[in-house]
Curated annotation (Swiss-Prot):
Pfam family, one: UvrA_DNA-bind
Entry's Gene Ontology cellular component terms: cytoplasm; excinuclease repair complex
Keyword annotations of the record: ATP-binding, Cytoplasm, DNA damage, DNA excision, DNA repair, DNA-binding, Excision nuclease, Metal-binding, Nucleotide-binding, Repeat, SOS response, Zinc, Zinc-finger
Native species: Staphylococcus epidermidis (strain ATCC 12228 / FDA PCI 1200)
Record PROSITE patterns: ABC_TRANSPORTER_1, ABC_TRANSPORTER_2
Annotated localization: Cytoplasm
Record's protein name: UvrABC system protein A
Domain ABC transporter: 309-587, 607-935
Coiled-coil residue spans: none
The organism's place on the tree of life at top rank: Bacteria
Similarity remark: Belongs to the ABC transporter superfamily. UvrA family.
Binding, ATP: 33-40, 639-646
GO molecular-function terms, A-Z: ATP binding; ATP hydrolysis activity; DNA binding; excinuclease ABC activity; zinc ion binding
Amino acid sequence: MKGPSIVVKGARAHNLKGVDIELPKNKLIVMTGLSGSGKSSLAFDTIYAEGQRRYVESLSAYARQFLGQMDKPDVDTIEGLSPAISIDQKTTSKNPRSTVATVTEIYDYIRLLYARVGKPYCPYHGIEIESQTVQQMVDRILELEERTKIQLLAPVISHRKGSHEKLIEDIGKKGYVRLRVDDEIVDVNEVPQLDKNKNHTIEVVVDRLVVKDGIETRLADSIETALELAEGNLTVDVINGEELKFSENHACPICGFSIGELEPRMFSFNSPFGACPTCDGLGQKLKVDLDLVIPDKNKTLNEGAIEPWEPTSSDFYPTLLKRVCEVYKINMDKPYKKLTDRQKNILMNGSGEKEIEFTFTQRNGGTRKRKMVFEGVVPNIDRRYHESPSEYTREMMSKYMTELPCETCHGKRLSKEALSVYVGDYNIGEVVEYSIKNALYYFENLKLSDQDKSIADQILKEIISRLSFLNNVGLEYLTLDRSSGTLSGGEAQRIRLATQIGSRLTGVLYVLDEPSIGLHQRDNDRLINTLKEMRDLGNTLIVVEHDDDTMRAADYLVDVGPGAGNHGGEVVSSGTPNKVMKDKKSLTGQYLSGKKRIEVPEYRREITDRKIQIKGAKSNNLKNVNVDFPLSVLTVVTGVSGSGKSSLVNEILYKALAQKINKSKVKPGNFDEIKGIDQLDKIIDIDQSPIGRTPRSNPATYTGVFDDIRDVFAQTNEAKIRGYQKGRFSFNVKGGRCEACKGDGIIKIEMHFLPDVYVPCEVCDGKRYNRETLEVTYKGKNIADVLEMTVEEATHFFENIPKIKRKLQTLVDVGLGYITLGQQGTTLSGGEAQRVKLASELHKRSTGRSIYILDEPTTGLHVDDISRLLKVLNRIVENGDTVVIIEHNLDVIKTADHIIDLGPEGGEGGGTIIATGTPEEIAQNKGSYTGQYLKPVLERDSVE
């Protein structure tokens, strides 16, 4: 290979079979292949891992002790490596304090901007707060028209209650003759009696002047006198003109509201100097939600209308409730909604000071008398949540609470002082509510004075530069205050990508994992241009990707395969995209060249009257949308990034159905009405969250096939002789498991301020079970051997047991034949976890009344995997069930029976229904971006 290159020899990480490959440096390299073929093993676990390890090795021993020992990847040699940076999808912060602006460091520059050129205003009077010298005050007064009559007033009392007799007397003794009391000029000896219960303003008339040449000295002396009297404040009463207010205190001259010196930390919601004191800078407060406390208002109190007070472990609260109802004559057999407002208020907010006596039965069976003020259900839940030392109680109470915007800062996170500072017409809280697109426009067109411009010039350059990068990777719809925990994997990755471009590093090896996830075809070109820009800076990019456009744009394409798991781990083809397309061995090449394709269905399923209707959807950016989801068909919801797809499907459709069908406590987004729920009895949300939070969860336990496998082992002769039951073969209970590692197979070593380290258990050698259990075999294999089998191997191994084979076959059908039965759930990718969930639903009996919701199921899937997935989804629909998918992938969109296209843009520019209908109908709609990209695909892939 001409030019510098990265040479990998003998890579054996995971399923790689001694891979040798040479990759050109300073190029855009795309690695592709089936899910599980070994792409990530080569890109991340070999090339990136070694680049990172070598960089750490080059640091001092002192620095290395904080970074920990990095294992050398299973590879013979790698030459030509550069320092490596990985941009994957697993590193998004879920911290509620982390926002788009903080992650990209834009917020640091905005804080600096407000600290350096911000202008503080009094939040009560709208007056600019500025500290002025006597000379500045003189100059401003002399700017008034000549012969203007003025009075210099010293405001000694501002809006304060009291009769202030002593103060007025003291002013008279100092020789002052006139006062202005509540806007009336009076003689100091003739001030009327002031009502001590009302607010009053008292100003001393220090001097009366006519503006003309030669008054500078007298004016300055009088100003100094007034400032001394009024502790640094001065009012100039301009006769027949507007009053002027001055202060030398950096305080409001009317009410004294003051702000200290402006500094960046004052605008940080992560600092006590800037955070809102009520919500501590979170912008949200947990409040008791009455809809969660009383989910069914048709129930009576005796039927358990107040859900948190149902008699469970104790009858304390039910007895108290009964006694309260007796005292206040509340009918416990009347539906809650028919109670009077007064009765509801007593139940929810308490009875005031009145004490109530009652006797309740304790857990031990004894009785006890109590006399107490009835605090009400809402204060009770709030108190128990905030004051209980029990984690269990706090968790139970939180089920009846909802996060609402803080009442003090209205969700802006900052203190009153920080929100009183303006640059242009907006404070910092208002600016971060802008979308990236609008923020870019605002900062590019910000009007500043010449002096402020010279101060802010460099800061604005940094802000505009970072915003431009975010805009260029298709994230213009995100608001700067969006919590980073709510970002999709693709969005989070593109944010990190934009941050890296902003750093302008050169000579770096970047390894990226599917940056096109969640991106509409329209925005793909911008992402590809961004990747090329990074390459042109002198960097090498290795991108694991399945997207057609990205593969075609690559300088060098590597196809890993030919299959998945044990059938993969080899480089099938590498070279320019054109070279790979001509390679008959390359599955990717065949799809790229059009020799293989996912064909458009010959017919679309008929849309009947059976449907779920949503009216008045207003969640997030949705603009009062009415939409129908037809049942027993495959519906795909499309639209550019940020157009409102997730708001409609995940926030409203799923949560509203889950609330009605599953009695879920999750509150749906804002909408008016939903109809047609009675036609469904089951809702399944198949998302990409892990199948379990601990290493114990695995595909075998999640799909339920492990129960059947344990039955098989319990039925063996050896197990019967030893008296082993099914439970003996569980690694979750005592008996058959290894007690040294409690059945985990690994031991967790806590490293305190470093991440926890997991090492294989030395007693069972990672097999999870004790020696006696492993002596029981079926067809020559023990239970640990079975857990180490791939799904495909296990399907053949158990082919004579239909119950097990059927469940395993569903995993094969969704393209997961390569994963092992005992693979830790935490190590599965989002796409793999989603397909395990799909498989576990597939082997259950269909009712024809189920609805499946999937959000971008093609994540991590090769086009051949997508072909399999579509067969599975169509199988679900053929059974009479309904599938609703959010998707950008055109291969999925073209096979839909019905499309709902949102847009036209992202963020505020979206939230409306652009078009609905078959793919052919959408393709004819000129207002639909999806239609524009769908049209040529339909023409190309239709069955001839």
